[in-house]
Amino acid sequence: ACQFIDENKDRPFILYVSTFEPHSPYHGPFMDQYDPEKIPVGPAFLKKPDTASLVNRVRADYFMQFMLDGVDQTTDDYAMNYAAYREDITTEIGWRTLRAHYLANITSVDRMVGKVNQAIKDAGIEDNTIVVFTSEHGDMLGDHGMLEKRSMFEEASRVPLVIKVPWLSKKQNIIEGSVSHIDLVPTLLDLIGEPIPGHLQGKSLKPVLEGEKDLSDNDVFVSWNGYDSAVPDRFLGAHEINRMLRLPWRTIITPDRWKLALCAGDQCELYDLNNDPYEMENLFNNPEQKDRIRDMASRIRVWQVDTKDNAPLPTT
């Protein structure tokens, strides 16, 4: 990446730099930098999501059995996943060590990003280069008793987003609200004065970056289309998990920080992220939330029409 920047500094370019880390197996440099016993954890750490969807409960049962029930480590399921993670998830300190190794992965990525930024400065193009830093997904890391992604929980679906547009502002600002990755391409095209193709589903966030608009009315939608039946068991766990992961999910996060996750074949989920940021209490079956659920579900259906999405939704 640094070489590419140097070789192309005299002409317009777009450079996409992707890293495998942080990702299982969570190994790499800086493995001993973080003390597992001092790694911060929240109230959802190694706590099964008893009121959540069946797929989340089954996944938690699968991962937590290693610690709580002492499953024979020679079983096929365990052997596949243990080999993939290369971590001891049979004890709490093992889970904490896994989190420490994940942080080590992030530190490695931070160093890499620093080198790319330095290459931009060395090339003399810092003042006319847009830099975007984000991530495809997060990782459960033991929260709600799970690992990796494949969940609508915040740990898996909420990611960092940093956008540097030097000609807009030299000042660092935190913009309150939520946005979607699908908005990045329209935003970048708008920032460089290029037309936005009509087939793109996202919208430009340039007015937000310029301070002309906020995100107070910005719903964010997250979709999971389900795994194809041909996907092998490795990394997914037991056969029951694979079956449940084939079901599509549609989720909305509203500006007032409520999250509704809908699936036609599973227990749906509703969380008040203001008062329950760790998503410990699923309010979907709370009678007091019927009107809210109906409103949020209708927004998902409008989004489906706009995007020509045909995933089945439950009756709400």
Predicted features along the sequence, with ranges:
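Bilobed periplasmic-binding protein-like "clamshell/Venus-flytrap" ligand-binding domains
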Residues: 110, 219, 300-313
